[in-house]
Amino acid sequence: MPTNTVSPAEFFSSDRQEAELSLIACPGAEVLTQQIDTHLVNWAREAGIEVDSFIAPAECPRFQSGDAKGLVKRSVRGHDVFLVVDPGNYALTYNLFGNTNHMSPDDHYANLKRLIQAVAGRAHRVSVIMPSLYGGRQHRRINRESLDCAVALQELQAMGVSNIITFDAHDPRVVNAVPLMSFDNVMPTYQVLKTLLKNRPDLNFHKDNFIVISPDEGAMSRNMYFSSVLGCNLGMFYKRRDYSRVVNGRNPIVAHEYLGESVEGKTVFIADDIIASGESMLEVASELKKQGAAHIICNATFPLFTSGLQKFDEAVANGTLTAVLGTNLTYRSPELLQRDWYLDVDCSKYTAYFVAAINHDMSVSALCDPIQKINALLEKHSAPAKV
């Protein structure tokens, strides 16, 4: 459980529970919601509470014109409601005038608002689990442009949402848009290391054998944390851009420049929040391989692979990449899950901890800072831990 002193029986005792718990899966988030529900049901049963599921069935059916509505199929009056949404699930489709449309983040966000409306203010409290923050990559204004994430957070607050739980936000400072709303930005560092060591138990984190490298300046904070807890050194790349041109909505990258010590003969770990097309990650890996890196392991909380898997297959085949880690917090294609080089990190239990803690009005501080669990994991694998 979240702390070593709390047992499932104490955690799910009725006198500590804020209100009866209900989970609602937005279309496209059913798998993750079911996994979260499985953990919660198991803990409740350990506490002597007989329950089959906490999930309240819901859907967002569409009319032939493309309009949709939110529908919750059982009462949630007085419940502590948690809605789970995956804005990155592009595999979901709907028909529009005879054409098949893939769901965009905008569609998923609209469905979330529909289901909040369907609850219609009857719930005791409404929380949103949005692992991939809607509009999170548009977190600041540089020109005459929208601030989608900030406006979305303000909309959710106005609709009565009390808590937002997100993972590895592109820039967590977006919470400044809603300073009076509970906002938890969760980093799955422990889950990533646990999966990595399970699949690569021979890893040696000594600074002579292992180095953490940030792919750009924006990812420095998460890579600094990895290097600090592992006790190894840190390097980084910075991107030189051509600010005179805009290609596909951004200034094109001219080159990746490396700042750091030699990587020759070392295992390199690169962490970022998103693998979109993956071009930057592959360019960084290629440059490190040219400098003599022995193995290169990439990690991204949200493995989108918007340009497909072929280039990553080629990078693994020619020895540039060793492995890629990604979480189950967003949709992953069946083709990706079948790749030998891809390691899937299960964060459903971690998410369930947050649901249970918030439902019982308990502190989540121990969940947000898992350093004790990380140190115990590294000690178990005889790796030098450093706080």
Regions found by a protein language model. Give the residues of each.
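PRPP-associated nucleotide enzymes
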Residues: 1-387
